[in-house]
Amino acid sequence: LAPSPEGFLGQSSYLFLRFAESAARHAHDAADLETESTLAIVAEECFARFSALAKTLDTMKVDRVEAMNPFIGPTREFERRTRGRNWVERVACTWVTMAFLQDFWRRLADGLPKAIRGEVMKALEGDTMIHVLRTELERRIALEPTLRPALALWARRLVGDTMLIAESALVHRDNPVA
């Protein structure tokens, strides 16, 4: 199994764009300035990853909009299915899906052509945003311990839905796994 470079970059760049938008909304809806400014770091890092991955498409002379377009519908459906009931569930959704997909994409990027592999791996390195989200969730749970069981169940559900998004990035002999 190896990813199609255009499909891999189209999906990952579009999802990082959506993660940036989600993190910005989380920051906007935060209850205090400390949380708002911390989540702004997540939005900034997601947007930087989007920019780096989209730039790789530009370098390959692939229209970034055309490369991302096939992933708009499935991504928005995924977001609809996984939208949390409240702010904490939405932050948990971003954390679980981002952590899972980023790890998955790092492993899948090993199958990309050597000419772009380094750029992609560099765009995906680092876990600051994952740690920031996790720390915020841990802080919320410490303030309100009754959140823990509900978030644990929510995260289990999210992993299943996120696996379906990950599976759609796989290509075997130019046939996408759907």
Where do the language-model regions lie?
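Acidic/His metal-coordination segments adjacent to aromatic residues that form catalytic metal sites
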Residues: L1-G10, P70-T94
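N-terminal topogenic module of multi-pass integral membrane proteins
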Residues: L1-H28
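Alpha-helical scaffold segments that form or flank carboxylate-/histidine-based iron centers
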Residues: S4-L9, D32-A48, R90, A115-M129, ...
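Helix-loop segments that flank and shape redox-cofactor active sites
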Residues: F19-A40, T82, M98-P113
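Conserved alpha-helical segments that form or flank metal/cofactor-binding pockets of metalloenzymes
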Residues: V42-F71
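A contiguous pocket-lining binding segment that forms or flanks enzyme active sites
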Residues: R106-M163
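C-terminal accessory extensions/subdomains outside the catalytic/core fold
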Residues: I165-A178
